[in-house]
Structures are given as C-alpha cells and as structure tokens.
Amino acid sequence: MPHSCRLFRFTGFILFMTLAINAFADEPPTVRVKGKGKGQDKTFVADRETFHFLLTNHKAISRTVKKLDRGVETVTESDNPEVAKKIQEHVPAMYERLKSGNGVRYWDPLFAETFKHGKKMKMEISNTEKGVKVTETSDDAEVVRIIQAHAKVVSKFVEKGFEEAHKEHPLPTKGETK
C-alpha cells in the first residue's frame, strides 16, 4: 500500500477516535449554541436557580402592572414566605444585571434589547411584606416601550411559568401605544 494511502487512513482513524472520545466524554461541549450573551458570571447560577424557583412556583405569585407615561409600576407578591423572599432576591439581582450590562436570555429578542438599554432605565425597588414594588422608568420613549413590553412578559411568566419562559418575545413596534 502506498505511503499516502496509509497516511490518509491513519489520519481518518485519528479523526474518528477524536470524535468518538469527545462523543462519550463526561463533560458537555463548551460551545455555546443558543445564547448570545457574555457567558456565565459568578452570580449566574444563583440567579438562574432563583428564576427557575419562581417559574416553578408561579401559581403562588400575584402581580399587578400599572402603566405610567414613562414606564411601569409593578407589585409582585406571594402569600408564601419562601416565594416572597425569592421575589425580593430576584428583582434587585436583575436590576444589577441591567446596570452592569451583564444580562440573561440574550436568545430572547425582548430581553436582549432590555439589557442593551439597561443604563437608560431607572428602577426604584421597595420590599413589601410579601414581595416587591417596582417603579421602572426612562426618559427615552423607545426604552419606555421596552420597559412596558418587558412588564407584560414578566406577567406572562407569572401566569404560565416555564411554558412562557421557553418562548421568544418580540420587540414592541414603534407604533405601539404606551
């Protein structure tokens, strides 16, 4: 057999073994498939676990949204003390992500845009006995539409839990009213 054929077969064997070893490796591949974000930071896992806890317990959560000229006022609460505590953890954690630009759910167009404009948003958070009251505003009309659309989606998370969280959410159109 000519040397080039043996080299070709040997290269093929090495390629096959490399793929086979990777296919059966204990650790998942490090390639990011879905997300477009900056990757995990030191608080990502804790934030995700809190979000998943809230989605799992969505039926124990109540939420009201009041549209304002420059944003929204929301009250998100639960009669369950454990759920109320998680709401009080989740909201300021997400505000920190807004301010830092280190968002989550970049695969979801609305969330990507929300975090893109996070520095143009002002948020006042106050704990209630059973959760949080938030006033979120902006001086930018486009950002106000994003804030209001985000509030609607969060209300859908409360209503439907994981069913809604697995969906992508479109950006509000410029013609949408406040």
How does the language model describe each region?
Residues 27-33, 66-82, 130-131, 135:
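Terminal, regulation- and interaction-focused segments at domain boundaries
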Residues 176-178:
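Short, solvent-exposed mixed-charge patches
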Residues 127-164:
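Short, well-ordered, aromatic-rich surface patches in folded extracellular/luminal domains
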Residues 109-139:
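Short, solvent-exposed interaction modules
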Residues 71-72, 79-85, 93-95, 140-144:
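Primarily extracytoplasmic ectodomains and periplasmic/lumenal surface modules that are beta-strand-rich
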Residues 2-12:
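Bacterial N-terminal signal peptides that target proteins for export
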Residues 11-22:
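Bacterial N-terminal signal peptides
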Residues 27-58, 82-119, 154, 158-172:
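A low-complexity, Ser/Thr/Gly/Pro-enriched, surface-exposed linker/loop concept
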